[in-house]
From Swiss-Prot:
Cofactor descriptive note: Binds 2 magnesium ions per subunit. Is also active with manganese (in vitro).
Record-level GO BP terms: acrosome reaction; adenylate cyclase-activating G protein-coupled receptor signaling pathway; cAMP biosynthetic process; cellular response to forskolin; flagellated sperm motility; intracellular signal transduction; olfactory learning; sensory perception of smell
Cofactor field: Mg(2+); Mn(2+)
Membrane-spanning intervals of the chain: 80-100, 105-125, 139-159, 173-193, 226-246, 381-401, 632-652, 663-683, 707-727, 753-773, 774-794, 834-854
Subcellular location: Cell membrane; Cell projection, Cilium; Golgi apparatus; Cytoplasm
Membrane-topology annotation of the record: Multi-pass membrane protein
Name of protein: Adenylate cyclase type 3
SUPFAM superfamilies noted in UniProt: Nucleotide cyclase
Cytoplasmic side: 1-79, 402-631, 855-1145
Modified residues (Phosphoserine): S524, S579, S1077
Biased composition (Low complexity): 516-526, 535-544
Length: 1145
């Protein structure tokens, strides 16, 4: 049983392992733990071949796909073989027409009929008029039979009077080799039909010629000639097999590159799509598109901007919904922090589904508050109706939490209609938000509402057109802001029947009585997948409603709808369906290969007609560099050709010593060239200097061409020297008269020296490292040298050969007539009385026809090589474009979520109820607000409806963000901005135990090392104050920061897997928020525990005293005033503040 050999097998040579080492990509960052590898098994049906030449892909399905691809690629070369056959028919027609007589009519008609068949077959195959099965299964064998019939017809009809063992042997060897390079069949059938053709041809010639022999001496000569024929055929078969192997190896490499490129492209597209979906779940598409456009600008364009880019847009006539959980404090007391976050995650995931169904754009989640907007970014006439239906559904959904927790929690919902300014502020941790007076009103509508009811304003009421029953809301009695503004409010009672009809038309019938969607009622208690403190996930169940989600995606165009595609992650995970996935991937690969094969990529790229070189010099240079380098197999073919050439010449003329000398010298020289060419392929087996020299030849075009020319020159010179030596040996002592007897040697059958020249043409074709123009030059060298010898130096030899052949084979009267003809100048072939064209001309024409055929094939191979190169370039460019888009999307995503969190959500599709969370024991939290910005903000026309005020706030927040680029603040993470409040935390890193400093556990560190990040956070707060001072000095404003800080443990995580919102929760966060809200402008307020730690780092404090904090009672607080010792920054420098004005001395 054959051994299954992978890429790392030491017996598998470096050449092949390098070319087939295609380990398909895995992405460790995305949690893909499996790599897709394709192994190559050294097995096959043609067991007579060496083991390393029997290549088969594993699995079998991939091998079958490759065989289809390979035969499809070879199908076009089938047309090349048809052209070869047509050229042979043209040759026969010319040879018969030149010396036309009655006995030439039969071969002439057969050749003409064959030529017509070749043309018809060419048209049918070229136009694709034949069924695919016939074209691939029948036509190759039909063409083989047609060519064989033409050769035997020419042999039997044209040489009927004087058969010789060398008749049509050159053409037979030519077509045998052509079968290997053109037929779209597996290697085994080609070997079989080639052997059958050669055996039949040899038997026919042997039997026919043997019947004409007159003595035993002629029988020995016939045996040597038959053996010479065998060596010619053997050479054609061996070199043909090597050619097939080299083509197979090249196509396997191209096939694997195509498969790898497809998987990489699919991988990149999938990741890019995931990033885009994640991005669009956080940001509206119009904002994300604008951000991507700006990110692609070069730095010079960005430097010309006077202000930081702000993505802010005005949206009028939208409905704003605020919803708050009533009784959240009671709920917090009944649950641990992690249980509370789980519960919120599940509840808000339900809200996100409802938001998708009712065309809402969720804006933010602020603790237990959820707010969204309808009519943004795309305007809807029924925005108010949708928002109210959303509110009713949320009230219904909270009943599940009430039943599960046995608490009195409820939802208080407020809706207001008006104008908002929507966008993002700052340069880091982007979150979409809205600002306007109407947003404030909507917030107050929620605050002044009643639990379990939907509270709406007069402006929302005006948009309902009486579609809901309402009652007075009396919101002013519960909210001073509403009372001061004189806003009339209402409470929704129930929907009228018309609303159901509207819901059915606009929401696809998703509403039920009381306005609550049926899907909001839980079918079973939901169990949540969460991450433990070590970051590992565990799943305890799911109630993800996939059908509802798909319906919501179909109903809401703004909801991210991922494209249907084959997911590589699923390929890695779904073990049960592995074979089905492999089939699907192979099908996609086949479609991709068909698509690129049908594209005329070479025609699209400007190339010169004659040379086929690219008109673009840079493209031509790239092609030259990437062109297939020297192949050991190609130079090995030259060695095989020279060996068979020597055997043929020795068999024909065993007494000529020059044959032996040229063989030994030529083989030594060719072995030197072969070893030098293989040193770069097997660097471990050769000295370093030789490897370096071989590599230099590979890299240099002119050196490669020179090396190839040397090989062909050696073959040509060996043949030329042997021909001239033979001529001198046999022609010198004798006087050339018609009646002279010759003693064998080249004089008996000089055609064989032309046949070995055909082998030199075959060796030229095998030089894959040179262009078709170089091959044409070398083939002209071979053909020109043989032509010169045939027509000049060897002219007497061929004349004597024809003279003796016709004299011996015919009757005395016919022989006398032919001798008279041969003795006249009519030997040039123009005299119609000659039975055959003189051998010196027929052999010369044969060489030119074969050279022309091989040149046509070389152009085809060159075109194929350039096509493969362009495919590779296009795939590379396509991957670069996808990668570039992925890079920008990734930059956006990681600017909205921490990198380790984004990586988690890009790994695979998450359920809405799935929770990502991590616990941290020792972190710092900071809130920094601009209390007097509210006085600065106005929506007057002079401020462009408030946009210019927000532009100034954007500059402030952007400058705060730019501080985070300093390496000193690498452990500080911006959490979010809430209006004009900036929230950040320190030590929130993926590693729970180390907080990102070292790999050692916290038990191994001192308190000062463990809390260094808290000191950095305090430095960051001081830097923010300095930054704001610089801004005030330049803008003549007097903004002041009110900052609160605290330290302790938190739970960090993401609520909503499909629309992720990253935040931190816990008592530490609550206290930090209270430190800010109860603080004093211009100061940083901390509690006593935080003050004790920060004192160790040289920070100065002033005692404020006990203050009352809601939910905590009285707390002793301190104001941080500065630092005695300056912070140690890299290179001893201090923080470079944005907008800092440096006075020059």
């Amino acid at each position: 049983m054959p051994r299954n050999q992978g890429f790392s097998d030491p017996e598998y040579s470096a050449e092949y392992s390098a070319e087939y080492s295609v380990s398909l990509p895995s992405d460790p960052d995305r949690g893909v733990g499996r790599t897709h590898e394709i192994s190559v098994r050294n097995s096959g049906s043609c067991l007579c071949l060496p083991r390393f030449m029997r290549l088969t892909f594993v699995p079998e399905s991939l091998e079958n796909l490759y065989q289809t691809y390979f035969k499809r690629q070879r199908h076009e070369t089938l047309l090349v073989l048809v052209v070869f056959a047509a050229l042979f028919d043209c040759y026969v027609v010319v040879m018969c027409a030149v010396v036309f007589s009655s006995d030439k009519l039969a071969p002439l008609m057969v050749a003409g009929f064959g030529l017509v068949l070749d043309i018809i077959l060419f048209v049918l195959c070229k136009k694709g008029l034949l069924p695919d099965r016939v074209s691939r299964k029948v036509v190759p064998y039909l063409l083989w039979l047609l060519i064989s019939a033409q050769i035997f017809s020419y042999l039997g009809l044209n040489f009927s009077r004087a058969h010789a063992a060398s008749d049509t042997v050159g053409w037979q060897a030519f077509f045998v080799f052509s079968f290997f390079i053109t037929l779209p069949l597996s290697l085994s059938p080609i070997v079989i039909i080639s052997v059958v053709s050669c055996v039949v041809h040899t038997l026919v010639l042997g039997v026919t010629v043997a019947q004409q022999q007159q003595d035993e001496l002629e029988g020995m000569q016939l045996l040597r000639e038959i053996l010479a024929n065998v060596f010619l055929y053997l050479c054609a078969i061996i070199v043909g097999i090597m050619s097939y192997y080299m083509a197979d190896r090249k196509h396997r490499k191209a096939f694997l590159e195509a498969r790898q490129s497809l998987e990489v492209k699919m991988n990149l597209e999938e990741q890019s799509q995931q990033q885009e979906n994640l991005m669009l779940s956080i940001l509206p598409k119009h904002v994300a598109d604008e951000m991507l456009k700006d990110m692609k600008k070069d730095e010079s364009q960005k430097d010309q901007q006077q202000f930081n880019t702000m993505y802010m847009y005005r949206h009028e006539n939208v409905s704003i919904l605020f919803a708050d959980i009533v009784g959240f404090t009671q709920l917090s007391s009944a649950c641990s922090a992690q249980e509370l976050v789980k519960l919120l995650n599940e509840l808000f995931a339900r809200f996100d589904k409802l938001a998708a169904k009712y065309h809402q754009l969720r804006i933010k989640i602020l603790g237990d508050c959820y707010y969204c907007i309808c009519g943004l970014p795309d305007y809807r006439e029924d925005h108010a109706v949708c928002s109210i239906l959303m509110g009713l559904a949320m009230v219904e959904a909270i009943s599940y939490v009430r039943e599960k927790t046995k608490t009195g929690v409820d939802m208080r919902v407020g809706v207001h209609t008006g104008t908002v300014l929507g966008g993002v502020l700052g340069q880091k941790r982007w979150q979409y938000d809205v600002w306007s007076t109407d947003v404030t009103v909507a917030n107050k509508m929620e605050a002044g509402g009643i639990p379990g009811r939907v509270h709406i304003s007069q402006s929302t009421m005006d948009c309902l057109k009486g579609e809901f029953d309402v009652e007075p809301g009396d919101g002013g009695s519960r909210c001073d802001y509403l009372d001061e503004k004189g806003i009339e409010t209402y409470l929704i009672i129930a929907s009228k029947p018309e609303v159901k009809k509207t819901a059915q038309n606009g929401l696809n019938g998703s509403a039920v009585p009381n306005g609550a969607p049926a899907s909001s009622k839980p079918s079973s208690p939901a169990l949540i997948e969460t991450k433990e403190p070590n970051g590992s996930a565990h799943a305890s169940g799911s109630t993800s409603e996939e059908a509802e989600e798909q319906e919501a995606q179909a109903d809401n165009p703004s909801f991210p709808n991922p494209r249907r595609r084959l997911r590589l992650q699923d390929l890695a995970d779904r073990v049960v369906d592995a074979s089905e996935d492999e089939h699907e991937l192979n099908q996609l690969l086949n479609e991709a290969l068909l698509e690129r094969e049908s594209a005329q990529v070479v025609k699209k790229r400007n190339t010169f007609l004659l040379t086929m070189r690219f008109m673009d010099p840079e493209m031509e240079t790239r092609y030259s560099v990437e062109k297939e380098k020297q192949s050991g197999a190609a130079f090995s073919c030259s060695c095989v050709v020279l060996f068979c050439t020597a055997m043929v010449e020795i068999l024909i003329d065993p007494w000529l010593m020059t044959n032996y000398v040229t063989f030994v010298v030529g083989e030594v020289l060719l072995l030197i060239l072969t070893i030098c060419s293989m040193a770069a392929i097997f660097p471990r087996s050769f000295p370093k200097k030789l490897v370096a020299f071989s590599s230099w030849i590979d890299r240099t075009r002119w050196a490669r061409n020179t090396w190839a020319m040397l090989a062909i020159f050696i073959l040509v010179m060996a043949n030329v020297v042997d021909m001239l030596s033979c001529l001198q040996y046999y022609m010198g002592p004798y006087n050339m008269t018609a009646g002279m007897e010759l003693d064998g040697g080249c004089m008996e059958n000089p055609k064989y020296y032309n046949y070995v020249a055909v082998l030199s043409l075959i060796a030229t074709i095998m030089l894959v490292q040179v262009s078709h123009m170089v091959k044409l030059t070398l083939m002209l060298l071979v053909t020109g040298a043989v032509t010169a010898l045939n027509l000049y130096a060897w002219c007497p030899v061929f004349d004597e050969y024809d003279h003796k052949r016709f004299q011996e084979k015919d009757s005395p009267m016919v022989a006398l007539e032919k001798m008279q003809v041969l003795a006249t100048p009519g030997l040039n072939g123009t005299d119609s009385r000659l039975p055959l064209v003189p051998s010196k001309y027929s052999m010369t024409v044969m060489m030119f026809v074969m050279m022309l055929s091989f040149y046509y094939f070389s152009r085809h191979v060159e075109k194929l090589a350039r096509t493969l190169f362009l495919w590779k370039i296009e795939v590379h460019d396509q991957k670069e474009r996808v990668y570039e888009m992925r890079r920008w999307n990734e930059a956006l995503v990681t600017n909205m979520l921490p990198e380790h969190v984004a990586r988690h959500f890009l790994g695979s599709k998450k359920r809405d109820e799935e929770l990502y969370s991590q616990s941290y024991d020792e972190i710092g939290v900071m809130f920094a607000s601009l209390p007097n910005f509210a006085d600065f903000y106005t929506e007057e026309s002079i401020n462009n409806g408030g946009i210019e005020c927000l532009r100034f706030l954007n500059e402030i927040i952007s400058d705060f963000d730019s501080l985070l680029d300093n390496p000193k603040f690498r452990v500080i993470t911006k959490i979010k901005t809430i209006g004009s409040t900036y929230m950040a935390a320190s030590g929130v890193t993926p590693d729970v135990n180390t907080n990102g400093f070292t790999s050692s556990s916290k038990e191994e560190k001192s308190d000062k090392e463990r809390w260094q990040h808290l000191a950095d956070l305090a430095d960051f707060a001081l830097a923010m104050k300095d930054t704001l001072t610089n801004i005030n000095n330049q803008s003549f404003n007097n903004f002041m920061l009110r900052i609160g800080m605290n330290k302790g443990g938190v739970l960090a995580g993401v609520i909503g897997a499909r629309k992720p919102h990253y935040d931190i929760w816990g008592n530490t966060v609550n206290v930090a928020s209270r430190m800010e809200s109860t603080g004093v402008m211009g100061n940083i307020q901390v509690v006593e525990e935080t003050q004790v730690i920060l004192r160790e780092y040289g920070f100065r404090f002033v005692r404020r005293g006990p203050i009352f904090v809601k939910g905590k009672g009285e707390l002793l607080t301190f104001f941080l005033k500065g630092r005695d010792r300056p912070a140690a920054f890299p290179n001893g420098s201090s923080v470079t503040l944005p907008h800092q004005v440096v006075d020059n001395p």
